[in-house]
């Protein structure tokens, strides 16, 4: 892998994002607005907001980064940009790492802003260390980014890329334990939840929120990081020059 080529790709993506203020607004404003909405939905029940607010700090950035990166990568193919880049002496891994660097940086800023607003302005309380919550929120956003880059290879249009949200992300939201504890689900659904990335992302944030810093938390984080690397590797293997 060439560090210079990957960094050049990242700088190009940064330049594109800078010229697209609407995307920046979507990335930075929407997750924060959703957390604020939750705060005022449970204004008379602060305990509920504290219980679900910490896990959602990681889930909202996961969703937005998944959506933005999958659409952006598809647009690069359909406009011919990806084909021109791959005609150059640039390895697939260099290209994907460059995109990963750019979107990981955006994900870090996004998750940090959401966390600062939640803890500073919305008075979200957590029993665990706030710094660790921010780190996990960033990790989950990067996971969403890597999965978005990978799954974009299977879409031919932006509409199809958007459809991955209800097809791939929404079932994970239902089964990760956010709505119903997994041990209270039907056995087949509980087993299925162990194969979903968002289960481990949610569990990690939930444990930090409850100040359960133990080996299970380390396992959850390790699974999230492993899946992130795996998704990027699969993305490099399935990367196509253009959409057929």
Name each model feature, range by range.
Residues 2-83, 92-112, 118-133, 137, ...:
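Transmembrane helix-boundary elements of multi-pass transport/secretion proteins
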Residues 110, 114, 118, 148, ...:
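Juxtamembrane/transmembrane-helix interface segments of polytopic membrane transporters
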Residues 37-46, 155-195, 199:
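Transmembrane helix segments
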Residues 132-155, 173-176, 226-233:
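Hydrophobic alpha-helical transmembrane segments of polytopic membrane proteins
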Residues 198-212:
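Short, membrane-exposed interhelical loops at transmembrane-helix boundaries
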């Amino acid at each position: 892998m060439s560090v210079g080529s990957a960094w050049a790709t990242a700088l190009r993506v940064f330049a594109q994002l800078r010229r697209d203020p609407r995307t920046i607004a979507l990335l930075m404003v929407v997750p924060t607005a959703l957390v604020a909405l939750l705060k005022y939905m449970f204004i008379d029940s602060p305990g509920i907001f504290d219980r679900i607010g910490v896990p959602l700090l990681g889930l909202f950035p996961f969703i937005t980064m998944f959506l933005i990166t999958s659409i952006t990568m598809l647009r690069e193919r359909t406009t011919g940009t990806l084909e021109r880049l791959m005609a150059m002496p640039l390895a697939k891994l260099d290209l994907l790492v460059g995109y990963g660097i750019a979107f990981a940086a955006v994900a870090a800023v996004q998750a940090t802003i959401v966390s600062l607003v939640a803890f500073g302005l919305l008075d979200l309380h957590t029993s665990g260390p706030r710094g660790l919550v921010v780190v996990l929120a960033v990790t989950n956003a990067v996971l969403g980014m890597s999965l978005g880059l990978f799954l974009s290879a299977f879409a031919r249009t932006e509409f199809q890329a958007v459809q991955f949200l209800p097809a791939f992300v929404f079932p994970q939201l239902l089964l990760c334990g956010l709505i119903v504890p997994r041990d209270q689900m039907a056995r087949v659904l509980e087993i299925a939840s162990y194969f979903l990335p968002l289960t481990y992302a949610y569990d990690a944030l939930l444990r930090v929120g409850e100040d359960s810093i133990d080996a299970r938390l380390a396992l959850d984080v390790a699974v999230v990081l492993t899946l992130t690397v795996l998704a990027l590797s699969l993305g490099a293997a399935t990367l196509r020059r253009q959409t057929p």
